[in-house]
Amino acid sequence: MPNMEPTTKEIKEQKIYQEMGLTDSEYELVCSILGREPNYTETGLFSVMWSEHCSYKNSKPVLRKFPTEGKQVLQGPGEGAGIVDIGDGLGVAFKVESHNHPSYVEPYQGAATGVGGIIRDVFSMGARPIAMLNSLRFGELDTPHAKYLVSEVVAGIAGYGNSIGIPTVGGEIQFDPCYTKNPLVNAMCVGLIEAKDIQKGQAKGIGNPVMYVGAKTGRDGIHGATFASVEFSEEGEQQRSAVQVGDPFMEKLLLEACLDVIRDHSDILVGIQDMGAAGLVSSSSEMASKAGAGLELIMDDVPQRELNMTPYEMLLSESQERMLLCVKKGHVEEIQALFERYGLEAVVIGQVTDDKMYKIIHHGEVVANVPVDALAEDAPVYHKPSKEPARYQAFQEEESFVPVMEDVVGVWKELLAQPTIASKRHIYEQYDYQVRTDTAVVPGSDAAIVRVRGTEKAIAMTTDCNSRYLYLDPKVGGAIAVAEAARNIVCSGGKPLAITDGLNFGNPEKPEIFWEIEKAADGISAACLELDTPVISGNVSLYNETDGTGIYPTPVIGMVGLVEDLAHITTQDFKNSGDVIFLIGETKAEYSGSELQKLQQGKISGRAPELDLTTEKKYQQLLLTAIQEGLVASSHDLAEGGFGVALAEATFKAGLGADVEVPFELNQLFSESQSRFLVSVKPENEAAFAQLMELEKVYRLGVVTEDDTIRVKHKEDQVTAKTTELRSIWQGAIPCLLK
């Protein structure tokens, strides 16, 4: 078949490079770097490697703001995943990754391959994946297409995670109209590693072979990285070829084989990296660039599952379940023998060179020859103009929303039926969250917890972000996202260690959007510094807009914490009647950005809830101390729906009730004031708990009751609700909406 690729002249004159994702100035920069016009393959290499998805060219100035260091950090940003130290020679590797655009076009495969990709990132570090989480955003469940997206995305996550045998243990889902045509699918993987086994994605040692392992290369996913770096349109729905297809059973074999190599052949393994976004070109050029080396690849040797593939297609394909290894000379047969035991191909496709060039050979001809750093390191970095949106000042000056609360119990029931608040059991029951048998706290509490085998320790993990707060005030909302994640870890008995961030925003070329990105990063950074949770990995997903309509700023925070002793594991549900109920933190009339405002006004506006990071840190440390001293029976973070929702949720599991008198007016029952915790303690621990919390804003509210009635009083006012009725509404809402 003749090669019909455009000539260098056609690429320039017809501006074909623009269709591939390069701007005029970027194309001119490539010409300047090469001292000539790039051919079609070279233009393709630069277009994907200089995409936002691979180069972070728009977000780098913002990412530099994040604190990335701490005594607990074993590996910060720059590798497949970040790693924190948990003692005993062990580390926890984790990262969040987005697969937003593919999940709108092809929701099952888009979500499934997002899971597969993040798993490979974690095991490429040498870590065994032990848990998956996800953070999902959809439009309102009022159209068949919205229901289809939810069902298919969840099925894709479940299909891949369940098949590969990694438990999906937690996550969050929010529903808002801005996500109708811009769903967000962020997957997080957590792995356990012996510190001595930490790997690097590098190709060094002149003459060392580079080996391709795993599935054969097809034409799926070509320009997937570019596809994820442009604004979406209705026509974009036709770009199904940019969505990859996953095979979890192949990935399971690849995972076990790679971990075998790392464990048993670390002396001959130089580096290992996943072929993710931008496929072979990304992994190979990054590995060489990190090592200060060059690379020569023979494309004829790349395993192919389709006929007549061009070097361009092989390099840019995002076919799944593929890894790239660099091994020491003379040991290829050993590596091949190991992979053959798993029925996997392991093929030498090139070698490390000393000239810092990225040379591609096909049919004996050099088809691309460019400086490797130009691809992997030297993408232009843009300092985008930033402008405060007009809405921000309007929100600051707006009269506060006052909810209609004539029928408090009626509002309570309505809130529990909102899909963002309602039980997600219908969704998480599709996930196998008990596989591997180490899940200590299953989905449905504040954080998931997975035991560390052979120790008394456990890992607490969560994903969090209330994007409505970020829409009102991205700096405050960014800080709240980190604070809430830490609250969830602490409520579960864990000490927060570090975060991974999935930065989902609209089009950064709009100054108002870039302002959101900058301010959100400022808020995240401030909270991470105060709470000592450095950013050790992450992902940026921009251009989440369709036909000019963008999402709320949605920086998903994935956080991991250490539970020092299994005895410290704490859940949100009340345990025994007679236990004493306390509220930590102050409740104010803060409804802007709340579920209640959305319910009653049909929109979000006003000033975001206040957050005092000093107070937040103090309350978290006090509560964690109380948990570690064995004083706490249950602990629950107050989030969407405020006190009323948290109190109801605490009664549901055991079907208990509560009799409480609150220090705030009943119309503030659903306020979303920050830095609050609902805690229950056994009567014999009440005095010790109260003494520990002395001088703080901690209120004794009442007791857990045996009947299934919740009574809430303030002075002369009282409301009463049946636990069973509230639970029925809460559990039935999402199955009903998805019908």
Curated annotation (Swiss-Prot):
Substrate binds at residues 98-101, 120, 244, 318-320, 541. InterPro entries: PRibForGlyAmidine_synth_PurL, PurL_linker, PurM-like_C_dom, PurM-like_C_sf, PurM-like_N, PurM-like_N_sf. Pathway: Purine metabolism; IMP biosynthesis via de novo pathway; 5-amino-1-(5-phospho-D-ribosyl)imidazole from N(2)-formyl-N(1)-(5-phospho-D-ribosyl)glycinamide: step 1/2. GO terms for molecular function: ATP binding; magnesium ion binding; phosphoribosylformylglycinamidine synthase activity. Mg(2+) 2 binds at residues 121, 274. It is found in: Cytoplasm. Its EC number is 6.3.5.3. Its main location: cytoplasm. ATP binds at residues 56, 95, 501, 538. Mg(2+) 1 binds at residues 97, 539. PANTHER family: PHOSPHORIBOSYLFORMYLGLYCINAMIDINE SYNTHASE SUBUNIT PURL. Part of the phosphoribosylformylglycinamidine synthase complex involved in the purines biosynthetic pathway. Catalyzes the ATP-dependent conversion of formylglycinamide ribonucleotide (FGAR) and glutamine to yield formylglycinamidine ribonucleotide (FGAM) and glutamate. The FGAM synthase complex is composed of three subunits. PurQ produces an ammonia molecule by converting glutamine to glutamate. PurL transfers the ammonia molecule to FGAR to form FGAM in an ATP-dependent manner. Monomer. Part of the FGAM synthase complex composed of 1 PurL, 1 PurQ and 2 PurS subunits. HAMAP family: PurL_2. This is Phosphoribosylformylglycinamidine synthase subunit PurL. The lineage of its organism: Bacteria, Bacillati, Bacillota, Bacilli, Bacillales. The gene is purL.
